[in-house]
């Protein structure tokens, strides 16, 4: 059987908590996990404050596609700080496979090597322009970092959202 669960990126803003409480936006599969997106040039202080607000509100923020933000690309210490706060990190499959460029792939490998990644997303919008390469990304992670780590990112951690 195939089960489909709703969820989408929620662009960070100053009204996040009221919007979540009033169910104007959805969480991942109706859970406390919130896939949170920022503008590519968001400041560290804004990211820290918004994710901290979600944590204080009892939510479990997943920072969507961390490979796209200047703040997280320029400072692995900042990524580690957020992870230590309780923020989960997500990158896109295309970034792992190299479709988004060599430097993005190298950054993703560093994040995985340092154990800072929790989820891999497909970022599939349609089958023509953004097709799903999640299987290819899984195979690459498994070959480079081991099947146990690949299973954690692609199977076990996502399953936790559904509990």
Whereabouts are the PLM-identified features?
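Glycine-centered helix-coil hinge/cap
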Residues: 101-104, 146-147
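Conserved, mostly hydrophobic/aromatic
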Residues: 65, 123, 158
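Short acidic/histidine-rich active-site segments
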Residues: 116-132
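Catalytic cores of alpha/beta
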Residues: 107
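Aromatic-anchored helix/helix-loop segment that forms the rim or "lid"
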Residues: 88-91, 96-98
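Active-site environment of divalent metal-dependent phosphoester hydrolases
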Residues: 11-13, 68-72, 96-99, 125-129
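Extended substrate/RNA-proximal surfaces in nucleic-acid metabolism proteins
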Residues: 1-90
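Mid-to-C-terminal alpha-helical segments outside catalytic/metal-binding sites
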Residues: 134, 138-163
């Amino acid at each position: 059987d195939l089960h489909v669960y709703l969820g989408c990126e929620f662009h960070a803003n100053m009204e996040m908590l009221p919007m979540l409480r009033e169910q104007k936006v959805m969480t991942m599969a109706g859970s406390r996990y919130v896939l949170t997106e920022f503008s590519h040039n968001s400041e560290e202080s804004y990211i820290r404050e918004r994710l901290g607000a979600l944590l204080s509100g009892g939510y479990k923020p997943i920072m969507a596609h961390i490979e796209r933000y200047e703040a997280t690309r320029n400072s692995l210490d900042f990524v580690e700080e957020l992870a230590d706060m309780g923020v989960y990190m997500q990158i896109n499959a295309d970034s792992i496979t190299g479709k988004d460029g060599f430097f993005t792939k190298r950054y993703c490998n560093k994040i995985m090597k340092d154990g800072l990644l929790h989820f891999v997303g497909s970022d599939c919008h349609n089958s023509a322009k953004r097709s799903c390469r999640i299987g290819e990304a899984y195979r690459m992670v498994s070959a480079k970092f081991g099947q146990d780590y690949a299973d954690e990112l692609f199977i076990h951690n996502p399953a936790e959202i559904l509990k």
